[in-house]
Amino acid sequence: MLFVWVISVAVTVLAILNAALSDGVFGVIGVSLGKGVLCTFYAAALAVLIDAFIALFIRRALPAKWFYHKKAVFTVGAGEKKFYERIKIRKWKDKIPEWGKFTGFSKNEIARPQDNAYLEKYFLELCYGETIHFISAYAGFAVLLLTPRVMLFSLALPVAIVNMFCNLPSYFILRYNSYKLEVLFKNNEKRAAREAEKNSSAVAENSVSFSSVNSVADAAN
């Protein structure tokens, strides 16, 4: 609901602004009042469509192997994590909507934290989301090329900026969660390695014991 509220307020303010600047009122931008209002809704819808196209293209057209979480582009360092902590991401991240319900994979919680196969799927969704929100944040500036030039500063640029600030918080949250998930993933790997080593040692001990029993039996014979 937060994004809907932000977009609704932004569109309403821009519609009023461009209506006021139109020929029907102050005559600043050189378009009719009706066109000023219609162009506002057109630009907002265009930004939404650009975001939707990017999301659909990335998820449906690009190979999943491009979004492997261990690639450098998806790796989050300690310095980046500190940046997210400085902007108090923990206080507001839960107020930003999570779009997993549209993909069939909810990221609201980690259902199986000790299952790395599950975490791999979770990572894939994070990497998809990071890419989509990062590209969408800047692709929205295409609106500047697709709206009347006389409305560049009163409409196109504000819409592009609002679109950017609607995408960047989600991008930050996904990156922050990715750092924490990587720690969990590595801990699971270490635990699995310890268990494998323990099982290997147990098998070796059993083999030695079995060999000793056979040796005693052979000596008795």
Give the ranges of each region predicted by the language model.
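Cytosolic/matrix-facing juxtamembrane and C-terminal tails of multi-pass cellular membrane proteins
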Residues: 169-206, 221
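Cytosolic-side membrane-entry/anchor segment at the start of a transmembrane helix
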Residues: 1-53, 120, 172-179
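Membrane-proximal soluble regions of multi-pass membrane proteins
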Residues: 63-118, 122, 195
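Hydrophobic alpha-helical transmembrane segments
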Residues: 41, 156-157
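Transmembrane alpha-helical segments and their cytosolic interface motifs
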Residues: 119-151
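Hydrophobic alpha-helical transmembrane segments of multi-pass integral membrane proteins
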Residues: 12-13, 45-49, 98-101, 130-140
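Hydrophobic alpha-helical membrane-embedded segments
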Residues: 38-89, 164-168
